[in-house]
Curated annotation (Swiss-Prot):
Protein name, as recorded: Cytidylate kinase
Localization of this protein: Cytoplasm
InterPro entries the record matches: Cytidylate_kin (IPR003136), Cytidylate_kinase_dom (IPR011994), P-loop_NTPase (IPR027417)
UniProt keyword list: ATP-binding, Cytoplasm, Kinase, Nucleotide-binding, Transferase
Organism of derivation: Xanthomonas oryzae pv. oryzae (strain KACC10331 / KXO85)
Enzyme class name: transferase
Length: 227
């Protein structure tokens, strides 16, 4: 039987704040949380371990089905990710992993293979789904949809600050180029290109604090939930 538990989708480009906002909103609502980007990154890690070529869709699809991905949700503190039993949480946040995940996500067969795995996260009392096609492809029937955006410069600045705080040396210019290239790949791919659902609420997070965005999203749910 199809689970009809409520779903809030939060889509947007890399660095728009959807991961942080989604985790906090899910924790406050007491709902489950799906980080679809982490799922693609996890497959990317497994593919790199197996030294697979992104030009070999059949091998990547086999890898997708053979890879066991587990999420240990720590609420607002973040998400711990295991690939075949190994903790890869820190590896998932590397820029190289993100680039590989973006390339893999452009392969229709891989997206199809992961579709039902993502939909399986939908269960009571509800789900907050964070990604790029949550509201358009994975959960088109979601009652609540949000699309977060921000300028490429704003997103590069946020990422640069995060990496510098972790002791990772990278230039703002390099990050900006990577983000702009990723935006182009995500928007131009044939299957499930990055775009806002027609019924999504658009929120530009440029210059806005995380808590303000969280309050707007939680308020949206409150306004649209029958009393």
């Amino acid at each position: 039987m199809t689970d009809l538990s409520p779903v809030l989708t939060i889509d947007g480009p890399s660095g728009a704040g959807k991961g942080t906002v989604s985790r906090i909103v899910a924790a406050r609502l007491g709902w489950h949380y799906l980080d679809s980007g982490a799922l693609y990154r996890a497959v990317g890690v497994a593919a790199s371990w197996a030294d697979l070529d992104v030009s070999d869709p059949a091998a990547l699809v086999r890898c997708t089905f053979d890879t066991k991905v587990e999420f240990d949700d720590a609420g607002e503190a973040g998400l711990r990710v295991l690939v075949n039993g190994a903790d890869v949480t820190s590896e998932l946040r590397l820029e190289t992993t993100g680039a590989l995940a973006s390339a893999i996500a452009a392969i229709p067969e891989v997206r199809s293979a992961l579709k039902e795995r993502q939909r399986a996260f939908r269960r009571a009392p509800g789900l907050v789904a964070d990604g790029r096609d949550m509201g358009t492809v994975i959960f088109p029937d979601a009652a609540f949809k949000v699309f977060l955006t921000a300028s490429a410069e704003e997103r590069a600045g946020r990422r640069h600050k995060q990496l510098m705080e972790k002791g990772v040396s990278v230039t703002f210019a390099d990050l900006l180029r990577e983000i702009m290239a990723r935006d182009a790949r995500d928007a131009q791919r044939v299957v499930a290109p990055l775009r806002s659902a027609k019924d999504a609420v658009l929120i530009d997070t440029s210059g806005i604090g995380v808590e303000d965005v969280v309050q707007r999203v939680v308020g949206l749910l409150a306004d649209r939930t029958p009393s």
